[in-house]
Amino acid sequence: MSEKPSLSIMHPWHGPILTQDNYESLCCYIEITPQDSVKFELDKATGLLKVDRPQKFSNFCPCLYGLLPRTYCGELSGKYSGEQSLKENIQGDDDPLDICVLTEKNITHGNILLQARPIGGLRIIDSGEADDKIIAVLEDDLVFSEIQDISDCPCTVLDMIQHYFLTYKASPEHLIHGKPAKIEIVGIYGKKEAQKVIELAHQDYLNKFCREKTTI
């Protein structure tokens, strides 16, 4: 008699192994692609990809965008972001760490796992909370895999990513009248700093969800 197939599905946040080589290669869960006119996000309770909202304005995410499994922006992440940005009372945003993945391939849908190498990141403060965006390249990508650090990345690519995150929540009225932005990019950092940010978010995850507070 054949075995019954398993009906359980691995939760994209809690199931996959983040890294097996000290943050040189990362497992990434992709939520949004450049083709999406709807903002999708992982439903943390169920592990299903859900519609968050239609994209309000004309800008689209210029890269694959998602989260790093087994990361959580909590106390350690918030404290470190505040120290590095010289700002007080910065908290973690209580979400998985976000990641942007560069590739020349046309990946047209999310809800997938892929392997990518971190090359740097954006230190972002959103309404007083740490909201860093790790930037990575798809492993074995024919174009972007040559990039080893953020300093190797074309300025035009970084400009598009920064512009998206600075404006995707802003209304035309907000921009026309120059109202203070809730989102602030306070720094751009390279690979080693990105790995530090990932490590702290991984430790925050262990502190939050694992009974034994493991040191990594």
Swiss-Prot record:
Annotated substrate binding sites: 39, 53, 65, 168
Chief localization: cytoplasm
Cofactor or coenzyme needed: Mg(2+)
Residues the record lists as binding Mg(2+) 1: 93, 98, 131
GO MF term set: inorganic diphosphate phosphatase activity; magnesium ion binding
Alphabetical keyword list: Cytoplasm, Hydrolase, Magnesium, Metal-binding
Any single Gene Ontology cellular-component annotation: cytoplasm
Signal peptide: none
UniProt keyword Cell wall biogenesis/degradation present: no
A GO biological process held by the record: phosphate-containing compound metabolic process
Binding residues annotated for Mg(2+) 2, in chain numbering: 98
Compartments reported by the entry: Cytoplasm
Catalyzed chemical reaction(s): diphosphate + H2O = 2 phosphate + H(+)
Gene3D superfamilies linked to this entry: Inorganic pyrophosphatase
EC number: 3.6.1.1
Subunit structure: Homohexamer.
Role played: Catalyzes the hydrolysis of inorganic pyrophosphate (PPi) forming two phosphate ions.
Family the UniProt entry places it in: Belongs to the PPase family.
Protein name: Inorganic pyrophosphatase
Organism expressing this protein natively: Chlamydia caviae (strain ATCC VR-813 / DSM 19441 / 03DC25 / GPIC)
Gene: ppa
